[in-house]
């Protein structure tokens, strides 16, 4: 039996470990997320959070999440939003959403660190298939009575491919 030098063995282990990390890092994530910082943490009603994402797989269903980051000083337990989604070669369809962020009894929902809270809220009741492949546009405006709406740090949209069981 042949002896392997310790340095050769360490090199071999390092190369194998690095290759595994590289291969895991190259795995395609079936997720899109775009968050936009709200200027001065004062969300004006005419400031729209916009973006686009591409859908190639129309056979799979997706979950759509609203992602919102606010401070502990945010004055309300909810936020009203006007969310628009536009399919390729179609017009933008808007829906008004009352997003609950917390309650006086249980406090803020989501994850908090110090005085910053982030919440991800599922917008569709069940997984949604996109009927057309291509680029989808989204637009999000706050429609609260306060203008500007203070203490909102960022807002965005997350689209996740639903894994088949």
Listing of model-derived features with the role each one plays in the protein:
Residues 2-13:
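Bacterial N-terminal signal peptides that target proteins for export
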Residues 22-25:
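C-terminal motif of bacterial Sec signal peptides marking the signal peptidase cleavage site
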Residues 27-30:
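Bacterial signal peptide processing site
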Residues 66-74:
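Short amphipathic, basic-aromatic surface patches that mediate peripheral association
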Residues 75-81, 151-154:
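Short coil-to-beta strand junction motifs in C2/discoidin
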Residues 101-130:
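Extended, solvent-exposed segments with strong compositional bias
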Residues 131-147, 151-161:
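Internal, hydrophobic beta-strand segments that form the core of beta-sheet-rich folds
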């Amino acid at each position: 039996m042949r002896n392997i030098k310790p340095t050769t063995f360490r090199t071999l282990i390092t190369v194998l470990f690095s290759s595994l990390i590289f291969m895991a890092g190259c795995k395609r994530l079936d997720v899109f997320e775009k968050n936009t910082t709200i200027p001065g943490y004062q969300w004006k009603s005419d400031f729209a959070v916009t973006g686009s994402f591409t859908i190639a797989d129309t056979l799979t269903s997706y979950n759509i999440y609203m992602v919102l980051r606010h401070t502990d000083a945010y004055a309300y337990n909810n936020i009203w939003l006007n969310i628009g989604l536009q399919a390729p070669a179609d017009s933008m369809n808007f829906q008004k959403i009352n997003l609950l962020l917390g309650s006086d009894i249980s406090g803020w929902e989501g994850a908090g660190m110090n005085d910053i809270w982030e919440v991800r809220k599922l917008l569709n009741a069940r997984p949604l298939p996109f009927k057309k492949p291509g680029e989808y546009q989204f637009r999000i405006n706050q429609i609260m009575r306060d203008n500007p709406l203070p203490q909102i740090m960022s807002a965005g949209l997350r689209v996740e491919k639903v894994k088949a069981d």
